[in-house]
Regions:
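A hydrophobic alpha-helical transmembrane-helix feature that marks the membrane cores
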Residues: 1-201
Length: 201
């Protein structure tokens, strides 16, 4: 529920920013400077606040979560400005793809191992390092395409892994923190969206 609600809120936030012509961070994709760093710091800071706040503080945790989603929408807003048609098409594509991966996980859960976690984390660190290098020494468009393609593959496996993790937690009936439990799949979807958008441009 929170995964779907998060996507709806982000899409609504982007539409709201566009409707009221809110100044965006469009130039962060061209002039990579303090604005990008500032946006990333706010996003990470809010995410940490959401994760660390106990679920018993229901209202406060939801306010932080909604604020984080709104900031994510603002960070994604420049993509809608770059090409609104591709942005809308990618939304449908990613939601369909995530639904497919979810069905695969439920159909063949034994094919997905929770031992993947360490390997996936190591590959994610490599991807982040590659992105950081590109921040200071821009890659060619072909290299960007290859990196985005690799990221889609990586986060597809993350999606399978995180969905399996949700299934296992649900079966164990552990104390639920629905927002935190949904963050893995939600972030997988966001990363799939960004990288698929760049592949389609």
């Amino acid at each position: 529920l929170y995964i779907l609600l998060g996507f709806i809120l982000i899409a609504s936030a982007v539409d709201l920013y566009s409707h009221y012509n809110i100044p965006s961070l469009y130039n962060i994709y061209k002039n990579r400077g303090t604005r990008l760093l500032f946006a990333l710091l706010i996003t990470i800071g809010l995410l940490i606040a959401v994760i660390t706040m106990p679920p018993k503080f229901l209202i406060g945790k939801h306010i932080l979560w909604i604020s984080w989603v709104a900031v994510l929408g603002y960070v994604l807003y420049p993509l809608a400005q770059l090409n609104r048609r591709i942005f809308e098409q990618t939304k449908i594509l990613v939601l369909s793809y995530m639904a497919l991966l979810t069905m695969i996980t439920f159909k063949w859960p034994h094919k997905i191992s929770l031992t993947w976690g360490r390997t996936l984390l190591m590959l994610l660190m490599v991807l982040i390092l590659v992105r950081i290098v590109g921040f200071f020494r821009p890659y060619t468009s072909q290299t960007h395409f290859m990196i985005s393609y690799a990221a889609v593959v990586l986060f597809s496996f993350f999606m399978l892994y995180d969905t399996k993790l949700l299934i296992v937690k649900a079966k164990k009936c552990v104390k639920a923190d629905y927002i935190n439990d949904s963050l893995g799949v939600f972030l997988d979807g966001m990363n799939l969206f960004v990288n698929m958008f760049h592949l389609r441009r």
